[in-house]
Amino acid sequence: SVQLANPDLVGLNVTIPYKEQVISYLDELDKDAAAIGAVNVIKIVRQKGKTRLIGYNSDVIGFTQSIEPLLEPQHKKALILGTGGASKAIAYGLKKLGLECKFVSRNLREEMLTYDQLTPEIMDEYKVVVNCTPVGMYPRADEYPNIPYQYLTPNHLLYDLLYNPDTTLFMK
């Protein structure tokens, strides 16, 4: 195991696509990670000859602290692009900030919208759009999520979780 091979290891990060799958290997979840259903940080605790793995989700903290100062009175509802582990943390954080959320997926699912269902009325109703997909990430930086950009206004707030490249086409 990793713990035996690296006795000095005290923790590690988890990224897509493993944020949800890793939960079954953990001994404990912090309350936010349990509510979100996704983990991106694992703390390794060694006590009395036993090793315990504890899962946390720091995505929600980083996201809410960075988006909260950008929110204005018209930002009451958010579209969340993607349905993976990161999107769950984003929805959890936005709800804590008082926003109503709707997921957008490529595939038709209950309680979600597809990209084809993003009408002018929906885009007008949901003034915050958060990209939680890998679309537009290096090395495919020439791509962007398939939303109707023509319906965006200066009252919209777009937020991209991707960090490579620094500015994605979604944000331009």
Residues covered by each model-derived region:
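Rossmann-fold NAD(P)-binding glycine/threonine-rich loop
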Residues: P154-K172
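Rossmann-fold NAD(P) dinucleotide-binding segment
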Residues: Q21-S24, Y138-L158
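NAD(P)-binding Rossmann-fold cofactor-contacting core
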Residues: K96-T114
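Phosphate/diphosphate ligand-binding glycine-rich loop within oxidoreductases
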Residues: S1-L70
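Rossmann-like NAD(P)-binding element
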Residues: E121-E143, L152
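Glycine-rich adenosine-cofactor-binding loop
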Residues: N57-V60, I67, L71, H75-K95, ...
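Short glycine-/small-residue-rich Rossmann-like dinucleotide-binding loops
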Residues: P17, T133-V135, L162-Y163
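Short, conserved loop/helix-junction motifs that constitute active-site signature segments
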Residues: P73-Q74, K95, I122-D124, N146-H156
